């Protein structure tokens, strides 16, 4: 394996993406980088962890930033063939492909409410809840995600219920490349990017709109600004890995199940310095 390299994908509309359909059947407007991210996610979450294929793509994907790590993999396409006298009848041929081996995404605020302690979620919907009430169905994902409101959430150990935070997720590495610090490379890359781009997701006054501004001014918060808080909904089995990267378990957030797997909330705060409100 050659030296891994990482590609960044900014939020994309992903219009027409077919949930659960094979990657080679997706419309041509879908970025190859996103298809590569989904190739890794489907290998890890769908094939290994048995998450339903139609649940792997969700309404946060269009509004998220995605990173994909690649490795240059040499593959033998044609074996060498010799005759009885040792003469080469068919030469050996090989090719090198930049193969996606890991991915991660960064979801901006606002978010859905914190999961319920003890709750069981399937495709982001709590058991017994109407999956259509938030527009979350196999329709226009970009529209559903863009309509998320800023809300007052319940307080937890590290979140006061209203501070904007970003969320890391969909961290996945192909099995044969685990143990090579690929996951750590992805996480530290995203955290470094956040430190360098702390205002990336902050809405301007124009974008936020005066109507929403009045609504938020009823709380302690004015124009939503990210102040360095990063969240992870971590599978219970990988909590120790996230701790190595600076995250702490939010005990008051509790434990819940996503696609049958136990999860916990984890947070860390990055030092990002002073920021100003965007006007344009």
Annotate each language-model stretch with its function:
Residues 168, 230-234:
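Conserved hydrophobic beta-strand within the GNAT/NAT acetyltransferase core sheet
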Residues 1-2, 15, 200, 270-280:
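Fungal eukaryote-biased detector of long internal structured cores
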């Amino acid at each position: 394996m050659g030296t891994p390299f990482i590609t960044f994908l900014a939020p994309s509309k992903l219009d027409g993406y077919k949930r659960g359909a094979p990657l080679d059947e997706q419309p041509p407007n879908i970025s190859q980088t996103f298809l590569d991210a989904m190739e890794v996610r489907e290998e890890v979450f769908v094939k290994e962890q048995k998450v339903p294929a139609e649940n792997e793509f969700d309404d946060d994907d269009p509004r998220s930033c995605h990173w994909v790590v690649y490795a240059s993999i040499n593959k033998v396409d044609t074996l060498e063939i010799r005759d009885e006298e040792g003469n080469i009848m068919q030469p050996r041929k090989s090719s090198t492909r930049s193969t996606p081996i890991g991915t991660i995404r960064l979801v901006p605020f606002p978010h859905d409410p914190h999961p319920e302690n003890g709750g069981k979620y399937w495709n982001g919907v709590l058991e017994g809840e109407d999956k259509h009430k938030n527009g979350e169905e196999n329709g226009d994902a970009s529209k559903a995600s863009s309509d998320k409101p800023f809300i007052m959430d319940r307080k937890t150990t590290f979140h006061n219920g209203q501070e904007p935070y970003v969320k890391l997720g969909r961290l996945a590495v192909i099995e044969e490349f685990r143990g090579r610090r690929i996951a750590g490379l992805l996480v530290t890359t995203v955290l470094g990017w956040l430190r360098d781009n702390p205002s990336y997701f902050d809405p301007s006054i124009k974008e936020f709109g005066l109507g929403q501004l009045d609504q938020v001014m009823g709380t302690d918060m004015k124009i939503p600004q990210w102040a360095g808080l990063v969240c992870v909904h971590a599978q219970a089995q990988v909590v120790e890995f996230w701790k190595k990267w600076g995250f702490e378990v939010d005990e008051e957030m509790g434990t819940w199940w996503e696609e049958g797997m136990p999860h916990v909330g984890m947070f860390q705060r990055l030092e990002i310095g002073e920021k100003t409100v965007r006007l344009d």
